Amino acid sequence: HLAGVVAAHTTLPVIGIPIPSGSLNGMDSLLSTVQMPPGIPVATVAIGSSGAKNAAILAVQILATADEGLKQKLSDYKVNMKEEVLVKDAKLNS
């Protein structure tokens, strides 16, 4: 798949997002992205839209290692996600 081809031609981090398609609903994409040979790493996230969201967050985490402003925004984002989950939990339990 494309992520593996890209990873074979660069020294930059590559994030693979398996796309849900076909009779296996993306499982074939997941396996081909995960099973790369030694020396050709691909960071692989979940199949579909949740994987795409996690890929974006992972990319920001990588970039934030060298950018304090981005690191703070990421921290704020994660705190906000936690607060949203707590609000949803409170609604479910009330």
Q: Where do the protein language model's features map onto the residues?
A:
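C-terminal binding/interaction regions
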Residues: 27-94
